[in-house]
């Protein structure tokens, strides 16, 4: 086998490896995208719940008098 054929074979092997790697990375991106979409939905639900909570009747810290030991 001459050097040119060996170089072509090496390039074909590298290309096959890169194609496999790209496919694996693509699958990971899809999984992460699905996970991010689910987390965004959970965050929207949490924000909605927090916005519907009645405000606390406790005074702000700036309005509180200092504790007796001061």
Swiss-Prot record:
Ranges in a coiled coil: none
Pfam families: SlyX (PF04102)
Endpoints of the signal sequence: none
SS bonds (residue pairs): none
Gene3D superfamilies the UniProt entry points to: 1.20.5.300
Family as reported in the entry's similarity comment: Belongs to the SlyX family.
Protein name per the record: Protein SlyX homolog
